[in-house]
């Protein structure tokens, strides 16, 4: 194990699971219910390729100038970017859905959601780093494990920086008793399985993506916020 300077990081193709996860809306500022949503079954759908960072999630970031759709499927409602919801629904194998309304990203700010397996609020925030290249336009945000995440959360001083991974790359008790002691790679599988069991897993796909690696040992890099 070693700390790396930014110049010592190189990108390499890395096979991984990409997962889509449902975060239940607990406060919609009255805006989604106006479109007909049942708040007990309304979710922001996030997408991530680093499942092990989900215990550190405490925000969902949207693009302030993007349009977001409220998509109804059966009796559930999903908030996703207008440009991306079709690919997400396809990944989930969901058909027969309809768009019941649209809303600007800036109007989603300060809505609240419930973390899918930790007793914690995940606040909806806005950031200019959000893109429409992949995912759902609703970015899983863990300021303890990502530079963009950390930087955008500086605009929201009430959002804590949670780092449930120790210096050896193992999950701590803060990740939850079910995952404590697991390596990050073990946690990827365990968390995905838990999400599936609890109904919070929206979809999962195998992909190959560009991920930062150590230029010396060629192993994937683990990002942690430190003092």
Which residues fall in each region the model found?
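Carboxylate/His-rich catalytic cores and anion/metal-binding grooves
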Residues: 68-112
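A short, polar/proline- and glycine-enriched secondary-structure boundary/capping micro-motif
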Residues: 56, 88-92, 184
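Substrate/cofactor-recognition hotspot
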Residues: 125
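Residue patterns forming the tRNA-binding/recognition surfaces of aminoacyl-tRNA synthetases
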Residues: 1-55, 67-69, 107-114, 120-121, ...
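Short beta-strand-to-turn element immediately C-terminal to the catalytic PLP-Schiff-base lysine
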Residues: 61-63
């Amino acid at each position: 194990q070693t700390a790396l300077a930014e110049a010592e990081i190189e990108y390499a193709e890395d096979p991984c699971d990409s997962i889509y996860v449902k975060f239940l809306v607990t406060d919609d500022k009255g805006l989604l219910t106006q479109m007909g949503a049942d708040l007990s079954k309304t979710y922001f759908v996030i997408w991530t390729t680093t499942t092990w960072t989900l215990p550190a999630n405490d925000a969902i970031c949207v693009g302030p100038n993007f349009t977001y759709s409220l998509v109804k499927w059966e009796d559930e409602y999903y908030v996703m970017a207008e440009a991306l919801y079709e690919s997400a629904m396809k990944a989930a194998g969901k058909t027969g859905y309809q768009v019941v309304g649209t809303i600007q990203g800036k109007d989603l700010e300060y809505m609240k959601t419930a973390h899918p397996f930790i007793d914690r609020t995940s606040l909806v925030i806005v950031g200019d780093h959000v893109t429409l290249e992949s995912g759902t336009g609703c970015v899983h945000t863990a300021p303890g494990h990502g530079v963009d995440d950390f930087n955008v959360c500086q605009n929201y001083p009430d959002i804590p920086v949670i780092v449930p991974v120790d210096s050896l790359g193992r999950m701590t008790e803060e990740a939850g008793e079910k995952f404590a002691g697991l390596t990050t790679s073990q946690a990827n599988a365990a968390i995905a399985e838990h999400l599936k069991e609890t109904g919070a897993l929206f979809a999962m796909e195998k992909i190959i993506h560009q991920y930062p690696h150590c230029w010396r040992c060629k192993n994937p890099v683990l990002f942690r916020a430190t003092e």
